[in-house]
Every structure is written in C-alpha cells, then in structure tokens.
Amino acid sequence: MEAGGGKRAAPEGTNGAAKRARASESSQVGVGSKLKPCTKFFSTSGCPFGSSCHFLHNFPGGYQAAAKMTSHGGTAVAAPPGRMPLGPGAPNGPPTSSVKTRMCNKYNTAEGCKWGSKCHFAHGERELGKPMLLDNSMPHPMGSMPFEAPPMPGPDIVPPSTFGASATAKISVDASLAGGIIGKGGTNTKHISRMTGAKLAIRDNESNPNLKNIELEGTFDQIKHASAMVTELIVRISGNAPPAKNPGRGSHAGGPGSNFKTKLCENFNKGSCTFGDRCHFAHGESELRKPPAAA
C-alpha cells in the first residue's frame, strides 16, 4: 500500500512541476520574445499576427539590422522606449508607424508605386528607418509633382484689346488745296468719312504756314481707304500740273490753264470711282475736253 501510494504521489508531483514549468516558459516566451525582430515582418510576405505577434516589428536600424542579426544569430536587443509595435499592413496601404521599416514591393516593378513620395514604405535601402513625414521633400523618379505650373498662353493668342484698334494718320498738303479737298459745304470730306468710316479733319501745320495737315482717325483699314481717296482727290484737284497763277478761278472754271475733264478717269473705267459727278476727270469720251493751249 505504501509502495503503491508512493508511486502515485511521485507522478502527481512530477506532472504538477512540468505544468508549472511549461506555463512559466510560455509566459517568458510571450514577454521575452518582444526583444527579438520578427523575421516574417521584415520579409515580403509580412507578418500575419500583427500587433499580437510575440516578436518585435519596430527594430532599430530597420531591415538591414534585422537581417544581419537573424543571419548571424545575434543577442536579443531591448526595444527602444516610446515606440509601439507595428500592426499588420500591406505595402502601399495606410501607415501603422511613423518610420519606414519595410521595403515597398511595388517600387521596383514595371507599373511602379502609385503613391510616389507619399508612400509609407521605403523606396530603396537609404529610406529605411527614416521618418515618413520628412520624406516628402525627397525627389522621386516614379512619382509626379503634386503641383504643376499653369500652361502659358500660346503665341497665336491675341489679346482682345488689339481687335479694332484705333489709329491716326497725318497727310501734309499745300494750303491752296485745302479748299478743294474740303469741297463746297464740306461735301468732299463728308463723302470720304461716309464711305470709309474714318474721321477726317484739316488743321494748320505747326511748322509751315504754307501747308495744311489732313488728319485721319479710325481703324487701320479705314485709314488706308480714306488715305487713298484723299490722294486721289488731291491728284484730281491739282490735275497733275503746277497750281495755276490765278487759283481764284478754281479748277472747275474751264478757262485757259484749267485741266478739268482733260483726262479720262481710270477708276471710272474700273467701276470704282466714288466721286461721281464731282470727279475732275472725264467719265467717258463725251466728257473729255481738250487741254488748254500753252501760253
């Protein structure tokens, strides 16, 4: 009986000690293993346990230090104070730490990393262990600039203010021609303004009292048209000859020394004469006159 009792007592005590030893070992593993880096976390597959993992996910020195320690069997290193272990995460996903401790598995692929400089994973070994928020200033070959300069206007774009711009022109003529250019009651100047749309005025010449200035104002096309009509009018008034000694008789007098209607109007034959009956050139053979005899 005593022997049997002794046999039963021994295994019971042994089993109790074994259970206590296993429980103590389990608790020590759960606490002490946090001093070693997790090999799964620093691999491309990642750690499936996340924050419940018994190994360290935030190792000083990042991937290189962890790989060197695990390959050479280094001693356990205490976790730095103030840092929380990383939770589960996948590359290109939301951050779980303020330090880049994992390599981005999209960076060296053909498609590249879509997050660019904002990626929370290291784009190269030089970024391991660096703060994420301070990494945005680094140039990134795969990322695009967050801000782009506005496109500059092309050379073909013309400012709206240049359309229909107003201009002025000045023609200096002999003062004796001013009356003929104006016409009776201003008929000639009014006709030119009505036909071209340009404003016409005759003023004194500042430097020569024997000259008059014909000032034109309007668009470039209006001034061009009005200038041509004024030139044509001057030619008709002067008759392509020096002014007569007695200008008071007028070019329409038809007396000796007058060239009125002595030449055919070139614009009338083209159908473009704008002076009509007031033209100083003949509109057809019926109006043509013989030039006066030379004195």
Swiss-Prot record:
Alphabetic keyword roster: DNA-binding, Metal-binding, Repeat, RNA-binding, Zinc, Zinc-finger
CDD domains, per the entry: KH-I_AtC3H36_like (cd22464)
GO biological process: regulation of gene expression
Region spans: Disordered: 1-31
Every KH domain range: 166-230
Pfam families: KH_1, zf-CCCH
Keyword RNA-binding: yes
Molecular-function GO term, any one: mRNA binding
Descriptive protein name: Zinc finger CCCH domain-containing protein 44
Organism: Oryza sativa subsp. japonica (Rice)
Organism classification: Eukaryota, Viridiplantae, Streptophyta, Embryophyta, Tracheophyta
